[in-house]
């Protein structure tokens, strides 16, 4: 939905915030924008191919010449509009000079980084960059959300600088020191070499600088575009002046340097493609969409599509499937390996997409309302319920600080956190030493430990979420997250055990050779770390093994805990509906989350023991079959140990009556049946919500002259003794069924109520109730 801000005042005197209006008419502009950005990505990849054969200045001159020709032809800047004054011509000249400099930086960065990285770094809208600079250099940067967006942007740039392997050796061989195509490229390469960074990293910094210059250039051009009669007229005149500025330089280059182009006629279509896709189409579509849509929407959709297109072409541009999109012919039997996709650039693209989405989002200063109609007086009525349930954003440092405080407050989460820190420390030591000694075994085991840390993180997050307060949407709170966490951890372990079992069976047939040089010290170190975890989480195993369901403990001493119950009811036509809640201090019980974490640690411990045993047999006796045999034994143990966890978690998720409380609940229902004034009960439902909450609902039929609150108190007390600490009791009388029969209920419902009514007129001993 498109958001528009209205200046009308509400009846109460408040100012109306953004109001949702239909956005179906914007679909065509969104599609047009996405199509233009897709073609711009094609044009920039084509530009990179052209720059391999054409000098940088010649390339910019031809692009400016073609753009000036089309824009002067379309806009007619000399025959339409007011006459441009001499002072304005001077400003247009300065505008053209700065535009040429930015183009030089842009396309030189393209030659250094390739089209994929150039699109990721340079194709950010002014809205995104201004929001980024506002967060970095002003005190009112837009709140925590904008701060996260700025952090994502910086992380994306760092990923390109540090974790992106961009074929540096090929680039060094391509332009050895002392040989460059022209004085301009020599100067730029000298500056990059002076900074002490590789060409690819220098290109990243150059494109970031060009991006900032582009945004400042656009901001400074706004007043000039108004003075000369619009942005389109300014662009036409500026491109024309740029051609005149670059013409002498191009002539000198043509006379002093040897051209790499074999046939200029073969480059006509590639240049037309670049001019139309990169300059003309993108400029006009941006102009139209910025008028029809909000700038934030334009930036968000445009950035997302061009980044996705960049990743797509970065992987398939040299593939035969893209030959139809390429205007410039690819040399036969040639597959380029420069500027290919890497893990760093993919991660960077993800962070760029996230940052563009966050930084381009408008700061909401009013409530978001939907027009639902008009009052009899003609005043517009708006619904603001959508924002009423939204939570306010919170700064990341404060969220981390409060989360850490909550983690350290409770025993379970504190144990997980301490063991996670120990596990991470061992993991990074293992990875560092593996990289230092070039040991593939240490590196692979380090990443295996890192995967185990992810299970600990999930368990820690689940332990933290269980203490979150209930909200309007999640009215029961987040206690069941620990059940889900344990269930997912159990599934992970079962999948791991299955694959280990299958691999072990395959290795039994053909045992491979094993390098045991580093296995023993690594396994001993892992065993020590995991034994610490076994000691830390053993209480979870003991609770889970002793009682498979969920339960709560009550203490009679006041200083151990507290227990209270309350009920409230109302009677309308002799029908009472009451809720009784008893809150009991939880002293233990099955914690599925902790059991899942414990089983993960146990599996790692068994793995370390198995590696030590198999390594000993291999080193002493040369029994290669010991490794798959130990793996088979360990996989079987893991599988069998996970089954009870999954069984208990499934029972909780399926709302089964807690097994250990079945007898108590059955006895409690018999006691309820014997309460004075109670005729019968129906629809008793009891289930385990979490490790410390057993919930239940029950309908109790009573005689007409009984006091509802007394029944509620007695039923609540009986079921609380049976372990139900979150109870809803509905009291029903004979007049209630008569009242419901008179309503517009279905025939089957009325028939069932009537039959139940007849059964209520007699006690079990046959006595008739008057």
Curated annotation (Swiss-Prot):
Region (His-rich loop): 539-579
The protein's role, per its UniProt record: Together with SLC30A6 forms a functional proton-coupled zinc ion antiporter mediating zinc entry into the lumen of organelles along the secretory pathway. By contributing to zinc ion homeostasis within the early secretory pathway, regulates the activation and folding of enzymes like alkaline phosphatases and enzymes involved in phosphatidylinositol glycan anchor biosynthesis.
Lumenal side: 51-53, 117, 171-190, 257-264, 322-339, 437-445, 502-517, 619-622
SUPFAM superfamilies membership: Cation efflux protein transmembrane domain-like (SSF161111)
Organism classification: Eukaryota, Metazoa, Chordata, Craniata, Vertebrata
Stated name of the protein: Proton-coupled zinc antiporter SLC30A5
SUBUNIT field: Heterodimer with SLC30A6/ZNT6; form a functional zinc ion transmembrane transporter.
Membrane-spanning residues: 30-50, 54-74, 96-116, 118-138, 150-170, 191-211, 236-256, 265-285, 301-321, 340-360, 416-436, 446-466, 481-501, 518-538, 598-618, 623-643
Sequence positions that bind Zn(2+): 448, 452, 600, 604
GO terms (BP aspect): GPI anchor biosynthetic process; intracellular zinc ion homeostasis; zinc ion import into Golgi lumen; zinc ion import into organelle
Organism: Gallus gallus
């Amino acid at each position: 939905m498109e958001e528009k801000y209205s200046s009308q005042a509400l009846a109460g005197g408040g100012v109306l915030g953004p109001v949702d209006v239909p956005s179906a008419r914007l679909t065509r502009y969104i599609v047009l924008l996405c199509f233009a950005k897709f073609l711009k990505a094609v044009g920039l990849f084509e530009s990179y191919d052209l720059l391999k054969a054409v000098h940088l200045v010649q390339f910019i001159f031809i692009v400016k010449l073609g753009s000036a020709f089309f824009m002067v032809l379309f806009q007619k800047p000399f025959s339409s509009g007011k006459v441009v004054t001499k002072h304005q011509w001077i400003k247009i000249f300065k505008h053209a000079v700065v535009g040429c400099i930015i183009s030089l930086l842009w396309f030189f960065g393209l030659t250094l980084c390739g089209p994929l990285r150039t699109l990721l770094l340079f194709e950010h809208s002014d809205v995104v960059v201004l929001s980024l600079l506002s967060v970095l250099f002003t005190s009112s940067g837009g709140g925590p959300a904008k701060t996260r967006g700025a952090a994502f942007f910086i992380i994306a740039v760092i990923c390109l600088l540090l974790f992106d392997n961009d074929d540096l050796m090929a680039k060094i061989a391509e332009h050895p020191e002392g040989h460059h195509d022209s004085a301009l490229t020599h100067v730029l390469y000298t500056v990059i070499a002076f900074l002490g960074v590789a060409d690819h990293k220098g290109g990243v910094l150059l494109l970031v600088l060009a991006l900032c210059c582009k945004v400042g250039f656009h901001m400074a051009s706004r007043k000039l575009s108004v003075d000369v009669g619009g942005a389109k007229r300014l662009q036409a005149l500026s491109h024309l002046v740029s051609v005149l500025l670059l013409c002498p330089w191009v002539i000198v280059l043509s006379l002093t340097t040897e051209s790499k182009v074999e046939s200029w006629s073969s480059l006509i279509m590639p240049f037309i493609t670049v001019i139309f896709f990169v300059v003309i189409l993108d400029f006009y579509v941006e102009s139209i969409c910025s008028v029809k849509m909000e700038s934030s929407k334009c930036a968000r959709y445009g950035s997302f599509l061009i980044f996705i297109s960049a990743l797509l072409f970065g992987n398939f541009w040299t593939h035969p499937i893209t030959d139809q999109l390429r205007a410039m012919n690819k040399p036969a039997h040639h597959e380029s390996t420069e500027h290919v996709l890497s893990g760093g650039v993919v991660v960077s693209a993800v962070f760029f997409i996230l940052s563009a989405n966050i930084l381009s989002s408008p700061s909401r200063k009013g409530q978001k309302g939907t027009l639902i109609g008009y009052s009899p007086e003609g005043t517009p009525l708006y619904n603001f319920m959508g924002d009423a349930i939204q939570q306010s954003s919170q700064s990341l440092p404060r969220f981390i600080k409060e989360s850490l405080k909550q983690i350290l407050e409770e025993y379970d989460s504190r144990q997980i956190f301490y063991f996670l820190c120990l596990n991470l420390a061992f993991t990074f030591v293992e990875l560092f030493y593996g990289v230092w000694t070039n040991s593939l075994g240490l590196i692979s085991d380090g990443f295996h430990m890192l995967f185990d840390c992810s299970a600990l993180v999930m368990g820690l997050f689940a332990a933290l979420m269980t203490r979150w307060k209930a909200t309007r949407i999640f009215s029961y709170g987040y206690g069941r997250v620990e059940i889900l966490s344990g269930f997912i951890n159990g599934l992970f372990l079962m999948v791991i055990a299955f694959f280990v079992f299958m691999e072990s069976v395959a290795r039994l047939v053909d045992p491979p050779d094993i390098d045991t040089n580093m296995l023993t010290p690594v396994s001993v170190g892992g065993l020590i770390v995991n034994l610490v975890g076994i000691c830390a989480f053993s209480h979870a195993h003991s609770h889970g093994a002793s009682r498979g369901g969920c339960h709560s403990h009550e203490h009679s001493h006041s200083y151990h805990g507290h227990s209270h119950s309350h009920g409230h009811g109302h009677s309308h036509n002799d029908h009472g509906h009451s809720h009784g809640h008893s809150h009991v201090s939880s002293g233990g019980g099955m914690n599925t989350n902790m059991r899942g974490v414990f089983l993960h640690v146990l599996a790692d411990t068994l793995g370390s023991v198995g590696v030590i045993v198999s390594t000993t047999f291999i080193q002493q006796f040369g029994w290669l079959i010991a490794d798959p045999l130990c793996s088979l034994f360990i996989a079987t143990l893991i599988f069998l140990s996970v089954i009870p966890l999954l069984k208990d978690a499934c029972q909780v998720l399926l709302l089964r009556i807690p097994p250990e409380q079945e007898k108590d609940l059955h006895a409690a229902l018999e006691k309820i049946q014997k309460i004075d004034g109670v005729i019968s009960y129906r629809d008793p439902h009891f289930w385990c919500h979490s490790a410390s909450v057993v919930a239940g609902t029950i309908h109790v039929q009573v005689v007409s002259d009984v006091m509802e609150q007394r029944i509620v108190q007695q039923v609540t007390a009986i079921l609380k003794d049976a372990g139900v600490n979150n109870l809803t009791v509905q009291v029903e009388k004979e007049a209630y069924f008569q009242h419901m029969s008179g309503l517009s209920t279905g025939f089957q419902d009325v028939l069932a109520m009537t039959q139940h009514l007849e059964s209520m007129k007699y006690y079990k001993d046959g006595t008739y109730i008057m």
